[in-house]
Amino acid sequence: MAPIRVLSLVLPILSTVTLLLTQFGECNNGRRSGDAVDTDFSGFSVPLEHSFEVDDVPRFRLRGALQFRGGRENSVYLSQNQLSEKDRNTLKDVAAVDGLYRIRVPRVSLQVDRQTERQYEGYLTAFVRACALVESHLSDVITLHTDVSGYVIGISIVTIPGSCRGIEVEDEVDLEVFNTTISVMAPVTAPVPETAPYIERMEMEMEKKGKNPQEQKSFFAKYWMYIVPLVLFLMMSGAQDQSGGGAGGGAANGGGR
């Protein structure tokens, strides 16, 4: 009887503990164990392709993948393949004839919620001199340019250093792994002209002129007391000169007779 009585007391306690553990396990910040993680950790990837040919005819192949992460600020990560021995030799041959090294990415939107029915809308291409890439030991900087809606509208690539100086490079040591810095550049909003303060200042000046009508008078209305005497003086002086000239002319004519 004693073991049965003890068991009857223990079972309710175990059931209560089990119930508490079950409720605590479901409390996961409003997200169940089967739900997806936050959108800040979700994303998508697009291929990064490159082409370097001696005949300068682009034939793109996979270089790596751009992995985009959603969130307040678009972030991008790049995973790249190593160059094979054949690719290293081809790249050096292209550099020897001053050929071009090209890259391209599809034109997509960086907004994760727009990737459900994503379709590529063409490609964006950039290039650099192959000799500059070789002499930089595959060190390049790739920048993706987006518009205000988040679509990729441009891509640029530069090497460090960016010039060709004819330096010999050991392909097995320096031409195997890319050293790439990649970033996303969004458009910068231009400063808005301060039209409101200008209009307010103009209205204040108009109000001041309305309160002081003396400032609204014309030039003649302000200085007529000086202009009129001057005009009369000039008129009188001109009349005196004409009368004096006529008298002198008559005397001269009379003396001639």
Curated annotation (Swiss-Prot):
Coiled coil: none annotated. The keyword Transmembrane helix applies. Residues 24-218 are lumenal. It is found in: Endoplasmic reticulum membrane. Residues 240-257 are cytoplasmic. Component of the ER membrane protein complex (EMC). The gene is emc10. It comes from Danio rerio (Zebrafish). This is ER membrane protein complex subunit 10. GO terms for biological process: protein insertion into ER membrane by stop-transfer membrane-anchor sequence; tail-anchored membrane protein insertion into ER membrane. Disulfide bonds: none annotated. The lineage of its organism: Eukaryota, Metazoa, Chordata, Craniata, Vertebrata.
